[in-house]
Design a protein with these regions (language model features):
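A short helix-loop-beta-strand connector motif used in the catalytic cores of GNAT acetyltransferases and
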Residues: 50-62
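A short beta-loop-alpha structural element at the N-terminal edge
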Residues: 11-23
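Conserved GNAT acetyl-CoA-binding A-motif
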Residues: 117-127
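Conserved active-site alpha-helix within GNAT-family acetyltransferase domains
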Residues: 106, 110, 118, 130-149, ...
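Conserved beta-strand-loop-alpha-helix junction that forms the acyl-donor binding cleft
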Residues: 126-135, 154-157
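A short, internal acetyl-CoA/4′-phosphopantetheine-binding micro-motif in the GNAT/acyltransferase core
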Residues: 93-100
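Conserved GNAT-fold acetyl-CoA-binding loop/helix
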Residues: 24-49
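Conserved beta-strand in the GNAT
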Residues: 62, 68-76
Length: 166
């Protein structure tokens, strides 16, 4: 299907183990877009364990256009002490380049918002790179507030091990 062809159906469904390869492919595409491909150490096996292992740590949705996998959203629950409620955190939302501008990202976000409301979450939140103005503008158009005073703090790899042993 070319970008010019119209899409007759767009369906959102929970990911299944058979989708892991599709999701990993899109994770790599997203990393290239975000100029972070050097950071991807994920494998199909590790993703499968995270999504479908004995104790899953995340969930995923798949977006299909006319039966073709064209998008995914990966999310998990966090917790707000201020609200004393769980929240829904969107780790990734990705729509393949050829399928952008068709409203699929909009539909995926709305679907996730419904999940958050159904699960009585106090928040639905995610991060966005500060240079990704198309995404920032899209999220603002959906009602998201971009929090200017917050920064992500991350400890991983050797610094994480050192901190744990300190």
């Amino acid at each position: 299907m070319t970008a010019e062809q119209s899409v007759n159906t767009f369906a959102i469904r929970p990911a299944t183990p058979a989708d892991v390869t599709h999701i990993m492919s899109m994770i790599r595409e997203l990393a290239v877009f975000e100029k972070l491909e050097h950071m991807v150490v994920a494998t199909d096996a590790l993703l499968h364990e995270g999504l479908f292992g004995e104790r899953p740590s995340c969930e995923a949705l798949i977006g299909e256009a006319d039966g073709e996998v064209v998008s995914y959203a990966l999310y998990f629950h966090n917790f707000s002490t201020f609200l004393t409620k769980k929240g829904l955190y969107l780790e990734d939302l990705y729509v393949r380049q050829a399928h952008r501008g068709k409203g699929f990202g909009n539909r995926m976000l709305k679907h996730l918002a419904r999940i958050a409301v159904e699960r009585q979450c106090g928040r639905f939140e995610w991060s966005v790179l500060d240079w990704n103005m198309p995404a920032i503008n899209f999220y603002k158009s959906m009602g998201a507030e971009i929090l200017p005073d917050w920064r992500i703090c991350r400890v991983s790899g050797e610094p994480l091990t050192a901190l744990a042993q300190a």
